[in-house]
Swiss-Prot record:
The keyword Cell wall biogenesis/degradation does not apply. This is Putative exopolysaccharide production repressor protein y4xQ. Its main location: membrane. It is a multi-pass membrane protein. It comes from Sinorhizobium fredii (strain NBRC 101917 / NGR234).
Length: 100
């Protein structure tokens, strides 16, 4: 999930949560507290998801390197550039403004 989509869902959830808690309890302080707790839980979940994706990418890269060693293949490019192995073709991060 991209950050933009997450950000919209976060704000939708927080506004709906605040409104519902206020309508049910009639207390602004309860609405603020539950909104802050919900915000914290959603942010922790997003952070855990990012860590999981990094771990999964690391495992996949390690598996590719291991199979390449068994077959005598070399990894192309610079492995210090994450995800590209040194190749910038097709990567939207390296596209020029004119090529879009």
């Amino acid at each position: 999930m991209s950050f933009g989509i997450f950000h919209r869902i976060l704000w939708l959830f927080l506004c709906a949560n605040t409104l519902i808690v206020y309508l049910v309890t009639g207390s602004i302080s309860d609405a603020v507290v539950t909104t802050m707790v919900g915000s914290l839980l959603l942010q922790l979940t997003y952070f855990a998801n990012v860590l999981f994706l990094l771990w999964r990418a690391h495992c996949a890269r390690r598996a590719r390197q291991t199979t390449g060693q068994f077959h005598g293949e070399e990894q192309p490019g610079d492995p210090r550039i994450a995800g590209t192995h040194g190749r910038t073709d097709g990567d939207p991060c390296f596209e020029d403004e004119d090529s879009r």
